[in-house]
């Protein structure tokens, strides 16, 4: 049963997320080659199989434990967005600053648009969201503590004019725009751009530009096809708008976990970018 009707700008936001935002993660195939995981056909097949397996596990976990899955996804997003906009550093302040930065966006969108976001969360994870909101309140409290810690250690944590400008842009986005357009604008134009502009020079130093682009297109197309198949299966029971929301965000969650493992766990620490 359909719970809500999305507005026109929400549909444009979802289309942008699917066709502009998701392809930034499709460079993971090229990243695996750069890391040496796909030098041989056996390694390529093993990497792709493991990537798909992890994504499948995330989807199944979401089906059986939707509220816990959403909680984990949101907190993973805090760190992934936060760290993704920062230059990698082997520092105890790196995770702290990442939590602050990512939390500003994630918690900002949520707590500035609680009624709209609650509807989206109910579509994604059902009606009983008390545990989710308790976790978010706790996460926001920890975020406030991170703000004070950053102010306390401000001599150790350098806040450049460029970074302060980025914070102002993010604040403008989450204050002025509805939640889905705000997420789309940040995800497509800030997070995706920072990711691609950081990794691309390293990728093309290990392979031809054409190969990196073709791998990205291949991974993107595969993701879109799988999403379309999933959309077809849930359309009858969930309705048009709800199906798009579910496929978009559960799909992003399923891709974020292997993407984070590869990028934040191996690629960026190795190349220090």
Residue spans for each PLM region:
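Cytoplasmic-side transmembrane-helix entry/capping segments in multi-pass membrane proteins
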Residues: 37-45, 71, 91-104, 158-166, ...
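Alpha-helical transmembrane segments of multi-pass integral membrane proteins
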Residues: 20, 97-117, 134-153, 165-179, ...
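Membrane-interface helix-loop-helix junctions at boundaries between adjacent transmembrane segments
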Residues: 56-131
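Hydrophobic core segments of alpha-helical transmembrane domains in multi-pass membrane proteins
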Residues: 13-21, 67-79, 182-194, 248-252
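N-terminal signal-anchor module of multipass membrane proteins
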Residues: 1-30, 249-255, 265
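Membrane-interface helix termini and inter-helical loops of multi-pass transporters
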Residues: 2-4, 117-132, 234-242
């Amino acid at each position: 049963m359909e719970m809500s009707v999305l507005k026109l700008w929400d549909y444009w936001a979802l289309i942008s997320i699917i066709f502009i935002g998701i392809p930034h993660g499709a460079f993971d195939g090229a990243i695996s080659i750069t890391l040496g995981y796909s030098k041989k056909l056996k390694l390529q097949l093993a990497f792709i199989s493991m990537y798909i397996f992890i994504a499948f596990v995330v989807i199944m976990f979401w089906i059986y434990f939707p509220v816990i899955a959403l909680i984990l996804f949101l907190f993973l997003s805090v760190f992934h967005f936060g760290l993704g906009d920062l230059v990698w550093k082997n520092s105890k302040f790196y995770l702290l600053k990442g939590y602050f930065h990512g939390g500003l966006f994630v918690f900002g969108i949520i707590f500035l648009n609680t009624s709209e976001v609650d509807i989206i969360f109910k579509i994604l994870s059902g009606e009983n969201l008390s545990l989710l909101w308790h976790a978010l309140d706790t996460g926001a409290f920890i975020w406030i503590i991170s703000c004070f810690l950053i102010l306390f250690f401000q001599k150790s944590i350098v806040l450049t004019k460029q970074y302060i400008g980025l914070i102002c842009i993010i604040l403008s986005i989450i204050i002025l725009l509805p939640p889905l357009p705000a997420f789309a604008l940040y995800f497509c134009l800030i997070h995706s751009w920072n990711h691609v502009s950081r990794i691309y020079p390293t990728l093309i130093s290990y392979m031809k530009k054409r190969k990196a682009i073709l791998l990205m297109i291949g991974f993107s197309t595969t993701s879109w096809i799988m999403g379309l198949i999933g959309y077809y299966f849930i359309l009858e029971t969930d309705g048009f708008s709800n199906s798009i929301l579910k496929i978009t965000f559960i799909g992003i969650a399923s891709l974020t976990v292997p993407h984070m493992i590869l990028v934040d766990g191996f690629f960026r620490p190795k190349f220090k970018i």
